[in-house]
Amino acid sequence: MFETTGFLFTAETTPDVTTDLAGSVGKVEELSVVADAVNVTDSPNCKSRLNSLLVASEIRRSGLDVILQLTGRDRNQIALESVLLGALSVGVNKVLCLSGDQPDKNGPVVVNEFNSNGLIKLSKVISGGTLTDGTKIKNPLPIYPGAADDLYDQLSKPEALSKLATKIKQGA
């Protein structure tokens, strides 16, 4: 995917609230003729859905390249490291690092141990072959972290561009 010289076209899919994995994967199969990769969302709007890594893995097996969206909202360090190791083990090495949508007032409790910047750093540590506690990873593989930012409504704020620049400096 990164070898192209022009624009990359990606499509986004949100896993369904279902136990039918084939249905969630099947809805993106026709995208292979127009998209270079499929972004798989991670419980958007802070709502439970079929596990995004499972869906991403199946899409990858079908021959499409995938970008796993990963939020720090719902997981602590141990869970995030486990998800990243799992992603690498099934060939999913592109991760869009996000802080995550916040829940409604009476919604679930969020973890927020890692924001998007923290996830980018964590991805780079794991790409370097260790976990954050120094444990060596057997058969380490690279992660290609990505970042997103909402600049459209925030360009009037002086910190908007510096937030994006920080993500880029951290390796996104």
Report residues per predicted region.
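Domain-level signal for soluble alpha/beta catalytic cores
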Residues: 1-172
